Amino acid sequence: MAERVEASSVPEGENTIEEREVGAMWELEQKLDQPMDEEANKLNNMYREKGLSMLMLLRLSFQSLGIVYGDLGTSPLYVFYNTFPDGIDDSEDVIGALSLIIYSLLLIPLIKYVFIVCKANDNGQGGTLAIYSLLCRHAKVKLIPNQHRSDEDLTTYSRTVSAEGSFAAKTKKWLEGKEWRKRALLVVVLLGTCMMIGDGILTPAISVLSATGGIKVNNPKMSGDIVVLVAIVILIGLFSMQHYGTDKVGWLFAPIVLIWFLFIGATGMYNICKYDTSVLKAFSPTYIYLYFKRRGRDGWISLGGILLSITGTEALYADIAYFPLLAIQLAFTFFVFPCLLLAYCGQAAYLVIHKEHYQDAFYASIPDSVYWPMFIVATGAAIVGSQATISGTYSIVKQAVAHGCFPRVKIVHTSKKFLGQIYCPDINWILMLGCIAVTASFKKQSQIGNAYGTAVVLVMLVTTLLMVLIMLLVWHCHWILVLIFTFLSFFVELSYFSAVIFKIDEGGWVPLIIAAISLLVMSVWHYATVKKYEFEMHSKVSMSWILGLGPSLGLVRVPGIGLVYTELASGVPHIFSHFITNLPAIHSVVVFVCVKYLPVYTVPEEERFLVKRIGPKTFRMFRCVARYGYKDLHKKDDDFENKLLTKLSSFIRIETMMEPTSNSSTYSSTYSVNHTQDSTVDLIHNNNNHNHNNNMDMFSSMVDYTVSTLDTIVSAESLHNTVSFSQDNTVEEEETDELEFLKTCKESGVVHIMGNTVVKARTGSWLPKKIAIDYVYAFLAKICRANSVILHVPHETLLNVGQVFYV
């Protein structure tokens, strides 16, 4: 090694010898392992918005009923009972409650969500994780720093740029300034995600139980246990059919929900005309004031029941990916909203006259002639609404897995037409057990309603917080507009939240327990994922070490292609050095494969792979980054291996055509390192007679020797007069030779080399970290799907390399 020179002895403006060497090696490493930003194809205007005819818009609005509004549409089944669980004392209380329902529907679903929040979508994708992805593109808030500037060139990587000095730029700088702010943002996002998972348990339970409750209304002597049993049977059937997908029966959803809305709207209009038209005075907000003045604390607590009238709003936002925003706005404004208002007004008109029927207001207000048809349609609508929530939960879990926030689970694509229709067996059975447990344990709608309301209002609060950042960073709204939106949203939602707090001991604790367990799982998994990535980054092998091994890497190069999987998008991973140290042989062609997820909903197939060469051509080492969005799936018939090798062949052709001569952009490592190569072979050969500890000693000495020869590794330009290159081969011949070699290696066999990593807490770590890593994460890693299973790697071509990471 060169002697170290103190900075004080070097003239100003000059670098030390050591600094010059380090700088030269850094420059060389950058040239040999270049950023991957040149060869990806760009699809221009792939997602250009297309104009829709009015007929097509109406058709899509109709279809959106079955997917988007099933959950929101079934709320009339249970709202009034949960608002007055102890009975109705004064008919004016019904008018006050109706007024609250009307303005809740107006402010939250209609104004806030349909016309404001739904515009904050990620290329059509909604939900808390979609908002988080949008924020990750506009600010550096992602905790796993595996992105590269080439990712920003993706067709789907849309973002806006803030003007320097603007309020948006200041907000961005503030958010990126501290690590704890990024973590706090992620915790908020995960909290909303956990509550949405809780919705996947509570929505089917309360919807199906409320719908089947109609049996008892027509037969008052029937035991309540029979109603619960019927609901459980329907729930078991619903979850058992999930693996078939909704592709074959999905066409029924929209007609069922359409008939449901027409039924409740017509019934509501009938009841208004028959019982009491004066309920229409509830459109005056004065009755809200009189309601709270008259009922006091009890009126405030009843907001927990009123809240159920807007449940399903978050599901509406999460499901907007299937339809144009304008179609959703038309369907809600001109059909769903009026039908819901008529339904609630009709029930209120009935309750003003028949206060004793507060427990079954919906079914009791139905005319006898249409009772059983309404019961059948109500049950169908409850199933459709539950199906939409269950499917939404699958999508949320899929997104969480892609963000590194949830253990790997099996995901099955159930439709050939629609990318978003998936099925998660593991999550499905957990949801089913949760639904059955909630339905059988509580039995009463009011207790499940309290739990449901708690989950819904917390998701809304999380959405409001994220919308503030969207309005500042993405939309660049004036801070006064942001302040008005924040104040109005928090005023309404915190009012509801303060009411559900009083009902935590009456069922409201259920979503909190579900959220706590889910948040623990997701937080620990993400924390361990970040620590694994940091460990790999710090332990990656330098290019100088690779160059020191020579063209054959100091190993026996056996025929075939080795795909070495790693989390790193740059640098040589630790798994490679660990592998060749213990097994001194490697394939003739080595490809480091990094499968990474980006904060975009999808990556087009044409832009999926990025390929670069590592080191000189004689090394035959490449890097391939396979990029996916959070909605993309690893399907078994994707033919990942062939697509990767096809992209590699294309890269070789393009690279050869772009080079004027075969040696124009390559770098030689043969000068003065032949001895290093021979010594390395001898060292590894001697390792066969020693134990593992001796292997590591030999490996260390080999690295030390390589480092001592760093000053002998220089670019090809400086060696032009020393090393002779053959200029006889044409570009076509060189390309043909390398492609033929690649084809021969492929025929010899492709081996997938993956790390079987055990993560342990470093000695001296504090107790919570040891529990999280050594017990919670270890358990989750043991029961989750292996990477090889997720990527559909054939078992016969898989080679696992054991590693232990101390984080």
Swiss-Prot record:
It is a multi-pass membrane protein. GO terms for molecular function: potassium ion transmembrane transporter activity. The keyword Signal does not apply. InterPro entries: K+_transporter (IPR003855), K_trans_C (IPR053952), K_trans_N (IPR053951). The chain crosses the membrane at residues 60-80, 97-117, 186-206, 226-246, 249-269, 300-320, 323-343, 370-390, 418-438, 455-475, 482-502, 508-528. GO terms for cellular component: plasma membrane. Residues 81-96, 207-225, 270-299, 344-369, 439-454, 503-507 are extracellular. Keywords: Cell membrane, Ion transport, Membrane, Potassium, Potassium transport, Transmembrane, Transmembrane helix, Transport. Residues 1-59, 118-185, 247-248, 321-322, 391-417, 476-481, 529-807 are cytoplasmic. The keyword GTP-binding does not apply. It is found in: Cell membrane. Belongs to the HAK/KUP transporter (TC 2.A.72.3) family. Putative potassium transporter. This is Potassium transporter 9. It comes from Arabidopsis thaliana (Mouse-ear cress). The lineage of its organism: Eukaryota, Viridiplantae, Streptophyta, Embryophyta, Tracheophyta.
